[in-house]
Amino acid sequence: MSQVNMRDMLKAGCHFGHQTRYWNPKMGKYIFGARNKIHIINLEKTLPMFNEALTFVERLASGKNKILFVGTKRSAGKIVAEEAARCGSPYVDHRWLGGMLTNFKTIRQSIKRLRELEVQAEDGTFAKLTKKEALMRTRDLEKLDRSLGGIKDMGGLPDALFVIDVDHERIAITEANKLGIPVIGVVDTNSSPEGVDYIIPGNDDAIRAIQLYMGSMADAVIRGRNNVAGGTDVFVEEAPAAAAVEG
């Protein structure tokens, strides 16, 4: 099993938190100190927690389970889409639509519409329409693809969420909590770890840090799938209860 090391995290700047005045006291036990009014995250705590999360994801993937990658803010979206595509996982990189998990039946209908429009665009149907109607359908297709393109092949609810910036994606986490779906999340010093089953204390803004988290998670999914291909029998453990997060 390939694991991330301290040097990787330092090079990526995972230890840089937010300004001290914006800190969340619930993250206090993961803070090493402060430098120039910026909180420094204790990577000696982060590293084993990150590797534990990677092990969990690898075990899930080995059981053919689906991990949904979520990162919709500007610094995360492109990386989330690229790494999710690399490992064949569903993702949300543009905007989290309310009810994406808790009202999946309705979302499924929108995905069906997306697929219909994709077929029409390919089979020449658009070319037979009036210019105005073709333009309207093209816009609908682009809008649906931007919102749902990353989950159109998910097939059903995911078995876990991996979230970059838990404050920014709080709606997604709340929906996952309601459905009992385990949440793995990168939690910065200004955020609350509430509702996150696998906490990864770390910088959730720096592109190099996001690349490290996402690349490592994608690698874990690929390793897990390879275990299945190789006939390895791997046990999937349950996520620790979110209630275990200390206030």
Swiss-Prot record:
InterPro entries found in the cross-reference section: Ribosomal_uS2 (IPR001865), Ribosomal_uS2_bac/mit/plastid (IPR005706), Ribosomal_uS2_CS (IPR018130), Ribosomal_uS2_flav_dom_sf (IPR023591)
Cellular compartments per GO CC: cytosolic small ribosomal subunit
GO biological process: translation
One annotated GO molecular function: structural constituent of ribosome
Key words of the record: Ribonucleoprotein, Ribosomal protein
Domain of life: Bacteria
Family statement: Belongs to the universal ribosomal protein uS2 family.
HAMAP family xrefs: Ribosomal_uS2_B
UniProt name for this protein: Small ribosomal subunit protein uS2
Annotated organism of origin: Pseudomonas syringae pv. syringae (strain B728a)
